[in-house]
């Protein structure tokens, strides 16, 4: 008889696909050969995403793992009339629900569980119809999960726009949250993206469990609040499995190190500020000029800045950066004036290799959770510059809850604009040896490095949570659908 399989349904984003594949492989190892993994592949909506996913699938298939297989779902029509990328993705996934149902029902082997992405709550309805336990893989923080679960209650309790509230918002397990730190989906309650956010919080209550890419020691108070039902007004929440950090580390290249890494080799320890705004991070010319001015005036601090160019196609879902034309983007003479202490890199850079380098002492990041986990893993303190989605809430978590970041003042109403003087102040605060604020952030970052690594060791909290998840899936048994 064929092994029971865990069906995994990821979306195509860089911070979603590979962590779910890594989690699937860990399930295989934890089951001791009792389970297999079947990955359902939705067609990516952009050519660049399709190329990335195809390359990742090819690498996995070439690795020779017998117990992980990939199945392609048929294409669906792209939605129109949406008000945000979250709603757009969610509507694509709802269109795929019949395809997911057919793919699972057509499997020859018994099905032990369905693990869906954060956006895939329609798939939980499919799992319920088929009698299969449904889990959500949550690639964000437990703090963000607490906010999501709390959102239906907030929706009923707060009558005005959240930004019009007097005082902070109370999320159990967290310090008081200023409305300015809320995700972009919560800032306009008249938009359908807000309705999607609240509906997602309700939908998660139908899950058998939620698998979170965090370590228990990083967010103990939040995880306790979720487990106690304080985020869901006394109603028991699904079991939460904090199994992170789940990070993918590709093998080192056989050729010589990347040029950015070679440049770092020549710099003193903990002396370089690394600036990178994610795979989709785009900075308009005014922001580029402010960053350049701040770096010039930052007291001689070294920097490595990944600066990307504008996309060829700016339609929804097509915001893919291009290689930057530095002479066109940067102020005249900037590269010459900072020669020797700064490197501006105009295309993709190996972020993990850079953060792992001993020369890196600080990280200006867009606050995507994957990038945050990488900085925590390598013990690099942060200057948070959120751009979109839940990133402002992540920035709040880094500063107020985890303590690994120096706050950076910005004008969210001006597209998250940061003045050069404010960035200069924050850079000096993070990087100067004499800065008390920087010392505290560096010390906390070093602590989180040790916490993250201990958590994933055998017997650590994340390893234990993952084994508990695996045991729970095996214990529940599998359903022969076909």
Curated annotation (Swiss-Prot):
Keyword Transferase in record: yes
Pathway: Pigment biosynthesis; anthocyanin biosynthesis
Tissue expression per record: Highly expressed in leaves, sheaths, pistils and embryos, observed in stems, stem nodes and panicles, and present at low levels in roots.
Pfam families cross-referenced by the UniProt entry: UDPGT (PF00201)
Entry keywords, A to Z: Endoplasmic reticulum, Glycosyltransferase, Nucleus, Transferase
Compartments (UniProt record): Endoplasmic reticulum; Nucleus
Gene Ontology biological process terms from the UniProt entry: anthocyanin-containing compound biosynthetic process
Protein name: Malvidin galactosylase UGT88C3
Lineage: Eukaryota, Viridiplantae, Streptophyta, Embryophyta, Tracheophyta
A molecular-function term among this protein's GO annotations: UDP-glucosyltransferase activity
Domain of life the protein comes from: Eukaryota
Its EC number(s): 2.4.1.-
Binding site for UDP: 279, 345, 349, 366, 370-371, 374
Native organism: Oryza sativa subsp. japonica
Keyword Glycoprotein annotated: no
UniProt cross-references to InterPro entries, sorted A to Z: UDP-glycosyltransf_plant, UDP_glucos_trans
Role: UDP-glycosyltransferase which uses UDP-galactose and malvidin as substrates to catalyze the biosynthesis of malvidin 3-O-galactoside, an anthocyanin conferring purple pigmentation.
Record: active site: 16 (proton acceptor), 117 (charge relay)
């Amino acid at each position: 008889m064929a092994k029971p399989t865990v069906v995994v349904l990821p979306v195509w984003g860089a911070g979603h696909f590979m962590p779910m594949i890594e989690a699937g492989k860990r399930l295989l190892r934890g089951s001791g050969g009792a389970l297999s993994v079947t990955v359902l592949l939705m067609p990516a909506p952009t050519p660049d995403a399709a190329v990335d996913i195809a390359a990742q699938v090819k690498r996995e298939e070439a690795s020779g793992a017998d117990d992980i297989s990939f199945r392609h779902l048929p294409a669906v029509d792209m939605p129109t009339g949406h008000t945000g990328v979250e709603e757009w993705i969610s509507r694509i996934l709802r269109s795929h629900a019949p395809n997911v149902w057919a793919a699972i029902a057509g499997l020859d082997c018994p099905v032990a569980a369905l693990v869906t992405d954060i956006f895939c709550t329609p798939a939980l309805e499919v799992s319920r119809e088929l009698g299969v336990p449904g889990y959500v893989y949550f690639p964000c923080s437990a703090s963000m999960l607490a906010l999501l679960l709390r959102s239906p209650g907030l929706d009923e309790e707060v009558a005005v726009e959240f930004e019009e509230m007097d005082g902070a918002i109370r999320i159990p397990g967290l310090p008081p949250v200023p409305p300015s730190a809320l995700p972009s989906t919560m800032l306009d309650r008249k938009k359908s993206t807000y309705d999607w956010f609240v509906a997602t919080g309700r939908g998660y209550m139908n899950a058998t469990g939620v698998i979170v890419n965090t370590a228990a020691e990083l967010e103990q108070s939040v995880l306790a609040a979720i487990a106690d039902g304080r985020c869901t007004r006394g109603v028991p929440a699904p079991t939460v499995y904090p199994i992170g950090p789940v990070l993918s580390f590709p093998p080192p290249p056989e050729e010589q190190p990347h040029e950015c890494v070679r440049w770092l080799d020549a710099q003193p320890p903990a002396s370089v500020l690394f600036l990178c705004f994610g795979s989709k991070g785009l900075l308009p010319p005014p922001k580029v000029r402010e960053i350049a001015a701040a770096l010039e005036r930052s007291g001689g601090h070294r920097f490595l800045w990944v600066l990307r160019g504008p996309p060829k196609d700016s339609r929804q879902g097509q915001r893919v950066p291009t290689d930057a034309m530095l002479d066109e983007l940067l102020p005249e003479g900037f590269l010459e004036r900072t020669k020797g202490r700064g490197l501006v890199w105009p295309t993709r850079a190996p972020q993990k290799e850079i953060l792992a380098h001993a020369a890196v002492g600080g990280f200006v990041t867009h606050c995507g959770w994957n990038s945050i986990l990488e900085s925590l893993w390598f013990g690099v303190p942060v200057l948070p510059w959120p751009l979109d989605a839940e990133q402002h809430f992540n920035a709040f978590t880094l500063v107020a809850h985890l303590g690994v970041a120096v706050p950076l003042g910005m004008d969210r109403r001006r597209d998250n604009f940061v003045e050069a003087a404010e960035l200069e102040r924050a850079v000096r605060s993070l990087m100067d040896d004499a800065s008390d604020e920087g010392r505290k952030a560096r010390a906390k970052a070093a602590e989180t490095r040790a916490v993250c690594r201990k958590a994933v060791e055998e017997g650590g909290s994340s390893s234990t949570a993952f084994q508990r998840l695996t045991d729970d899936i095996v214990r529940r048994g599998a359903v022969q659908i076909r």
